[in-house]
Design a protein with these regions (language model features):
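C-terminal charged capping/lid subdomain of soluble metabolic enzymes
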Residues: 183-185, 280-350
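Non-catalytic interfacial helical region
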Residues: 85-99, 111-126
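Short glycine/serine/threonine-rich phosphate/pyrophosphate-binding segments
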Residues: 106-113, 134-135, 249
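ATP/NTP phosphate-donor binding region
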Residues: 1-97
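Active-site segments that bind and position negatively charged phosphate/pyrophosphate groups
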Residues: 199-307
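Buried hydrophobic packing segments
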Residues: 84, 111-115, 185, 250, ...
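A glycine/threonine-rich phosphate-anchoring loop and its flanking beta-alpha core
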Residues: 15, 113-203
């Protein structure tokens, strides 16, 4: 077992342990001994784990209800969120009760936002069942849904009281979801995580999955170190958006047919290519990045136009009027924040 403590406004632990899902009540009882519980999941994850988690919670004395919505990024919208919160109200859940987000990034984002806003906030636990959620979105307290204008534009910061990651749940993931998670993992390699790039080069995770628990722990620790310094993204936390400025544009323009980790991988390459043009990154580093991305079966190019990507960037959360904060890789394994105008941003895609 690996336990990583995050000293945020609500301090909590991230527990990474094989088989932890079967003992979920051992972790929740000390935190919430007497309350009602709502488990939020989606149509992909619920058939695998909902019944067993619900039975374990009920056996431990909890009264449990559940809410399952259609899987996919297209469900992460205001209408689905309101339906969830209306259901919570219909169940007469109180501020003393608990929400469990059982699923990948979409489940965690939407369920977390429901927890942040229902009755002005109730406790919630993240139980990530996808690689992407395990290494990134379940940690740090960002919650949101998408709007027509762009991705994650309606949200709140709300830290969970626990993140419980059972790597055994990754065994039921389709191949695409493993690849999807690798996009975010490679991102961490460019945020000064010692040895991560070398490990991924020598033993690509997509082919050496036995090392996944250690990789998850390294990514979570890296994110914890940043979140503890900048919980609400007023400074260095923006580094975690490497690949996301262009990546979110690709997702939106594709109507979310391009999955998040895939889009982040392409976004990293596009920004790195722009950095080479601007003399901020050498060509060798760019080629090594491309090779690493390809080694994890991720794409490095897109057919989506520059205009569509830049249009989405105007709605990016890091945009402030005429300027936008971007994350630029400046060496192999290191990235820096930079404020540019939207006109200057366009030159990174020329």
């Amino acid at each position: 077992m690996t336990r990583i403590h995050i000293n945020a406004s609500t301090p909590y632990d991230v527990v990474i342990e094989e088989g932890a899902l079967q003992r979920i009540t051992d972790y929740i009882k000390p935190l919430k001994p007497n309350c009602r519980v709502i488990i939020v999941s989606d149509s992909n994850v619920a058939p695998h784990y909902l019944d067993s988690v619900k039975a374990n919670m009920e056996h431990a004395g909890y009264a449990v209800c559940d809410y399952v919505f259609p899987a996919g990024e297209s469900s992460k919208n205001a209408h689905q969120l309101i339906d969830l919160v209306e259901y919570m109200a219909a169940q007469s859940l109180t501020r003393k009760d608990l929400l469990i987000a059982l699923g990948g990034g979409v489940v965690g984002d939407m369920a977390g936002f429901a927890a942040a806003t229902y009755l002005r906030g109730i406790d919630y636990v993240q139980v990530p069942t996808s690689l992407l959620a395990a290494v990134d979105s379940s940690v740090g307290g960002k919650t949101a849904v998408n709007l027509e204008a762009g991705k994650n534009l309606w949200g709140a910061f709300k830290q969970p009281i626990l993140v419980l990651c059972d790597p055994a749940t990754l065994n039921t993931l389709p191949e695409m979801e493993w690849i999807n998670g690798c996009g975010e993992i490679i991102k961490y390699g460019f945020l000064d995580v010692p040895g991560l790039l070398t490990q991924l080069e020598n033993r690509p995770l997509i082919k050496h999955r036995g090392s996944v628990s250690g990789v998850i722990a390294r990514c979570v620790q890296a994110k914890a170190d940043i979140v503890e310094q900048d919980e609400r993204e007023s400074g260095i936390r923006a580094l975690l958006n490497l690949g996301h400025t262009f990546g979110h544009g690709i997702e939106k323009a594709s109507h979310f047919e391009v999955h998040h980790g895939y889009a982040v991988a392409i976004g990293m390459v596009l920004m790195a290519q722009g950095a080479v043009k601007h003399g901020e990154l050498d060509t060798e580093a760019l080629e090594k990045l491309k090779a690493l991305i390809k080694a994890h079966d991720l794409p490095t190019t897109t057919t989506i136009s520059k205009e569509e990507i830049l249009a989405a960037a105007k709605h990016d959360k890091k945009s402030e009027g005429a300027t936008i904060k971007i994350v630029v890789p400046t060496s192999y394994g290191h990235s820096e924040l930079k404020v540019v105008t939207h006109e200057e941003l366009a030159t990174y895609l020329d």
